[in-house]
Every structure is written in structure tokens, then in C-alpha cells.
Amino acid sequence: MDQTYSPGHMSYELVKADEDFLSTTPSDYSILRRRPETSPYYRTPGPAISRFLRRRYSVEPTSSDYLGNGTIPTTVMYKICSYLNKKDLLHLMSTCKRFRDIGKDSSFWQFLNLYGKHISCSSLHAIIDRKVQVLRLNSATINVEVFPPWHNFPILNPAMLTHLDMSSSKFENPSVLLEILQRCHNLYALSLELCGIIDDQMCKEIAKNTNLYFLNLAMAKSFSAEGIVTILSSCRKLGELNIGWTELSGDVINLTCQLLPPSLKRLSFSGTRDKAEMNDDNIKRICDTCKQLEELDLSDDVVITENCLDHVKNLKNLRILTISRCYGIEPMAFLSLQNLDIFNVYGCVTVEGIDVLRSRLRPTRINVSPLSSIAIPTDGESVTSIWKKRTRDWY
């Protein structure tokens, strides 16, 4: 039989519930209102089934600092850091002051590869301050930050750089390149290929590197007579010089041929095209001054004739000669070059003519290298090394 609820009966139940609530002790009430602790739980990976497991509490905290001074010797920490690449080393330096001081040691920053990176000017100077010796900035973009008027700029000390590759680098402001060159007075190798305008002030800073051996200025622009004279008058230990396609004026070409250092072993003076100053007389002047030349590139110098080959043959150490697209030279004169290892004449003769040269000039190799490697930082299989100096970490 169904039970019938009357209004009086409902009021009786509410009164009964109130009496039970009032009879509850304060301790029971606080227990009921307490929320469960969710932090010890975590969701485990798996299928659609939701499983929650209780996390095991860690051991009692200890006051021992296992990485503090005196526990692990500093020499051991230096050894550990020597196996880290630059990215992991920076992460380690951000953990504590001790690791930051250890990570700043110059032994970890002897070389650095920033190929194609976007980097601020202040960050680049901070890297140079860590006494980097070999720095690759090929195709990098260097930006300039905007600082408030009250910002205190740090004093830029002389850099320890010996090998610097800034080929195809992009500078937001030409003054950035000048600031970098102002810090570098001990360079052994420098590449400014495709770096845009090289003014007289930059040439003066380059000239301060009196021990410079490799200098690549290919496709740079705006060289003045004063700038080129400053460089060639101071850098008398140059072994490899590349000034191809630099759009030199006639006066600058004459001065360059007169001031080339006798120490040169590899020279690229290509791309003068129809400049009348790049003639047989200046080729004679080059051969008389630089008698130790082992490789000479005169490609796209269309004014020179076969008469210049008489002077080239006097270079006893010459092993590689490139005269590609020198249309003013009579092809029959090529047969007089008997003592070369490599002879590049791209665009001067036909395919049949190449076969004739290979048979008549044997064992000279014909048309082996279409691109010049004179003073070029990366050459051959070492795509991350510059002038045979490594720039890449082990991993």
C-alpha cells in the first residue's frame, strides 16, 4: 500500500532533519566540509579509461647542497661542461650563479657558429666579450636595439677574434659593422664578401690587423683609393686576397696592382670586365711583384690579351690559373702553358677545343673548378669550418 505524504508529515521530516543537523558536533561538520587533496593525484597515460594513481611522496628534504662549493670540485664541473654544446651550456648557466660563472669561461667559447641567425648587436658584443676566437656569422642578420637615453652602454674592449666570417651578413645599420671591426685588431682571417659598402673608416680598421693572412672582399662595394691604399700598405703579410667583382675604379685598379704585397700566394682579381686599366701592363706588374703566386684568377678581365701570358709563365710556383671569359686572349696561346696543374678557361673555347687542350697539355687538368676558392672561408667538404677551423659543436 502506497504511503501518502501530507503537509503535516513533510513539516515533521524537516524538523527531524534540523534536529539531526543541530546534533552534529563542530568537528564532524569541519570534516564533512573538507575538500579532498587533489595534488597527490595525477592522470596516467593510456586509452579512454580514466585512471588516477596516488603519487608517492618524496623523501624528507635535506639541507645538503650536492652541487655547492666543496662538494663537487670545480675542475670536475669544468670537465662536464666541456662536453656540452652551446645551447645546453646556456641552459646550465641559467640555473645558478655558480654554473653561470663556470659557463663564462673562455675555454668553452673558443669557436661559435651563428650561420643564418638573427642576433642583436648587444648580444653579439656580449658573445665577443667571452673571448671567442673563431666566429662564423655567414648570412646572419644583426639588428640594432632601441635604448632609452639614460642607458649606460658598456665599454667595448678589444676582441680576441682571429677568424671572422661575415659573408653575406645583413646589418640594419652600417655602424654595426664598423663597431665590430673596431674591436678586431688581431685577425688572421677575415671575410666581408657581399657585405655591402666598405667605406674608408672600415678600411682603416681592417688595416690595423697587420697579421692578416686571408682577406676576402669579393663583391664588396665603394672602395676608394684611400681605403685600398690603407689596407695594402699595412697588411703586408697577406697570403690570400680576393678582390673579385668589387667594382673598382680605374685609379684604384692601378694603385692595387702597385701595392700588392710580395707575400701573396693566391690572388683573385676577377670581374673588372672592360676596365681599360686592367691591362697587360698591370698583369706584368702583378707578376713582377708577387713572384710566389701559386694560384691566379683573372676571370672576366676582357681587356687583357695573350701577351700577358708571357709574364704569367715567369711565375715558377704557379699551379692554378683561371682566365675564364677572357675573350681578348687568342685560344692558340693556351698551348704555351705547359707546367700547370689546373687550367680553367670556361667560356673561351668550344667543347672540341677543351678536348684538344686536354690532349696537348696533359697532365694539366682543364676546367676543374668553375668557382674560385681563394680566401673563401668554407671550401670543400668542411661546410661548417672556416679556413679549416671548426665552428660546430660535437652534437
Which residues does each PLM region occupy?
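N-terminal adaptor-interaction module of cullin-RING ubiquitin ligase components
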Residues: 1-155, 161-162, 178, 203
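C-terminal capping region of solenoid repeat domains
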Residues: 1-54, 63, 76, 251-395
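Leucine-rich repeat
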Residues: 64-68, 74-77, 94-100, 104-108, 118-126, 128-134, 155-163, 182-189, ...
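Flexible interhelical turns and helix-capping residues at alpha-helix boundaries
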Residues: 85-88, 188-191, 347
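Concave beta-strand-loop units of leucine-rich repeat
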Residues: 114-116, 137-141, 166-170, 192-196, ...
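Long hydrophobic alpha-helices with heptad-repeat/coiled-coil character
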Residues: 155-186, 260, 272-273, 379-383
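Solenoidal tandem-repeat scaffolds enriched in leucines and small polar residues
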Residues: 184, 188-285
